[in-house]
């Protein structure tokens, strides 16, 4: 299937800005069918846990790690099995190199990762690798939109597992299959109170999506650059930037320490980091929404909702705003088309979920959709997949 699809796309690309995919893989907005796939009860399929920041770092993740240790071990095992044919000594390399580097991690992440390794019985190097490999290649769609009354909604699909083991029986990516079993929601507590919310893969201590009540919401999408996540990992592995900030740790730091939309924006725009990223930031007030396109040491591009060409929404996949997507990976065009069909009067959890449940923003890599409202502190994670003949990414 993948071979025939690739040939068709290669033939079509010569003069096309947006390549219409061949049936049955073509883009499709379910709003055209007057479908509603949003079922709020599905949020309860995802379990909630507490991470208490008042506890020592060595104690914060023990419950989560213990409850999910089989899933964590299974995922890491699949990862190593995928790497081993190309790198026969992969497991020794991971155990030795990442194990030796773990003590050099910044606190509190160092103690948290050590405790997860202890609670699961999984070697320290493997838990360390698990906590940074999301920095390399995560393809996603994030949306910030406001309704006619200026209420802001923030959502994203998280797509992960590209080229990580195609399952010819289930027609799905092996890593994506494993990750769907590991999705959790987290209440982060401080001084006995809720500080912020996130969803995570069990045992992963960074943050890709988070909401701080009455302050801001945050998602992070990979930004593919020549000097990208691999470069940051190599710098870290060779000790050139042992205390550097991974993008998911910078997101977590922002949620823990910043109290307003503007403070969070300034911090995300200006803090040096190890991997390029798009930070999509939402607030609780009208027009509070932006896309921060980050390089390693600065902001390359800032796009504000108040000046968006779409007027009432921003949509980010993994390309700079205003640039053309790679023809094999154009999720912007179907996303824009479906958002325009939604219209501003239908903005809300239901409407945006249906946009993100439309192909190809929904694809074989999609593991979940998260929906957030800073104003109401509402945070929902809904498991996603794209069964049948669906585009692989």
Curated annotation (Swiss-Prot):
Q: Name one GO cellular component term.
A: membrane
Q: Tell me where it resides.
A: Lysosome; Secreted
Coiled-coil residue windows: none
MF terms in GO:
fatty acid amide hydrolase activity; N-acylsphingosine amidohydrolase activity
List the Pfam families.
CBAH (PF02275), NAAA-beta (PF15508)
Alphabetized UniProt keyword annotations: Disulfide bond, Glycoprotein, Hydrolase, Lipid metabolism, Lysosome, Secreted, Signal, Sphingolipid metabolism, Zymogen
* Enzyme Commission number, as recorded: 3.5.1.23
Active site (UniProt) = 140 (nucleophile)
Q: Which domain of life is it from?
A: Eukaryota
Q: Kindly state which reaction or reactions the protein catalyses.
A: an N-acyl-sphingoid base + H2O = a sphingoid base + a fatty acid; an N-acylsphing-4-enine + H2O = sphing-4-enine + a fatty acid; an N-acyl-15-methylhexadecasphing-4-enine + H2O = 15-methylhexadecasphing-4-enine + a fatty acid
Q: What class of enzyme is it?
A: hydrolase
Signal peptide limits: 1-16
Cystine connections? 29-338, 386-390
What does the entry give for GO biological process? fatty acid metabolic process; sphingolipid metabolic process
Please give the pathway this protein is involved in: Lipid metabolism; sphingolipid metabolism
Protein's UniProt keywords contain Hydrolase? yes
Query: Manganese: is it a keyword of this entry?
Result: no
What the entry says about post-translational processing? N-glycosylated. Proteolytically cleaved into two chains alpha and beta that remain associated via a disulfide bond. Cleavage gives rise to a conformation change that activates the enzyme. The same catalytic Cys residue mediates the autoproteolytic cleavage and subsequent hydrolysis of lipid substrates. The beta chain may undergo an additional C-terminal processing.
Site Important for catalytic activity — annotated at: 159, 318, 331
**Stored InterPro entries:** Acid_ceramidase-like (IPR016699), Acid_ceramidase_N (IPR029130), CBAH/NAAA_C (IPR029132)
Q: Which CDD domains match?
A: Ntn_AC_NAAA
Function text: Lysosomal ceramidase that hydrolyzes sphingolipid ceramides into sphingoid base and free fatty acids at acidic pH. C.elegans contain specific sphingoid bases, which are unique or different in structure compared to the sphingoid bases found in other animals. Two examples of these distinctive compounds are: 15-methylhexadecasphinganine and 15-methylhexadecasphing-4-enine.
Q: What's the family?
A: Belongs to the acid ceramidase family.
What is said about its interaction partners and assembly?
A: Heterodimer; disulfide-linked. The heterodimer is composed of the disulfide-linked alpha and beta chains produced by autocatalytic cleavage of the precursor.
Record-given protein name = Acid ceramidase
**Organism of origin:** Caenorhabditis elegans
The primary gene name is asah-1
